[in-house]
Amino acid sequence: ISPDKAPASLMCVQDKIRAIRRAGADFVEVLDFDGDLRSLSAAQFITLLRDRYGVKALMMGFNHRFGSDRLPDISDYEKIGRGLGIEIFRAGELRDHTRHEPICSSSIRKALVSGDILSANDMLGYPYRLKGSVVAGKRLGRTIGFPTANIDTGDSNLLIPGSGVYAVDVILPDGKVSRGMLNIGRRPTVDHSAEAPLSVEVHVIGWNGDLYGKEIAVMFLDRIRDERCFTDLDALKKQLSADCQAAIVAC
């Protein structure tokens, strides 16, 4: 309804489609949530599903509501479904037994923003993934032996986890996977400003190819430490060596 106020996405549309197909779906269609669709009541939308797609059964999330009237209870949707010859199912609630709360996108976003990658991945059931194109940076990492690829996620609205250093697996353009250490933050050691733009940059361990202009993806495995400011580049280099070892043995 208000794209500028929508929460950040946990997965891009293309990856959602691939995931749904891997789960066994024969057909996937993304509906344009325009004014006409927004105005439909629950009954009108279920009727559309029957008439346009021949839907015989509809699965709803345990706390999901839809339609301009947002009916309050699953029984209301079941009643509409019976009148249209559609069986309505409600998915069971999944709970995070560590946090003692339902697993939902809001809980996952909260964990990612706080840097709690292990909890986020546990709730997701897979490592959180971020992808984008590699753009030119200042190339300062090369001068201390840790070249980095600066990732531009573009306008994908993908959620970027909280600032810090992370152990990641990097999916390279050729499909190969290499371990990496990734920094999210404002690079206080070299930029010296709290107003510096947020950067996402990854060092691919043991790899020296050219990635500029190519698309890569990173899968978050664990958080290594907070981002912090070092007194000089030698101190930064020493810490990066330790971070590299931590990334190698992560997970």
What function would you assign to each model-found segment?
Residues 20, 58, 120, 168, ...:
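Residue-level signal for inorganic ion chemistry
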Residues 15, 119-126, 235-246:
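A non-catalytic, amphipathic alpha-helix used as a structural packing/dimerization or gating element
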Residues 29, 101-104, 216:
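N-terminal alpha-helical segment
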Residues 1-84:
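N-terminal Rossmann-like or analogous alpha/beta NTP/dinucleotide-binding catalytic cores
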Residues 32, 92-94, 222:
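Residues at the C-termini of beta-strands that transition into short coil/loop
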Residues 137-251:
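Phosphate/ribose-recognition catalytic cores of enzymes acting on nucleotide-derived substrates
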Residues 81-186:
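Glycine-rich, Lys/Arg-enriched anion-binding loops that position phosphate/diphosphate groups
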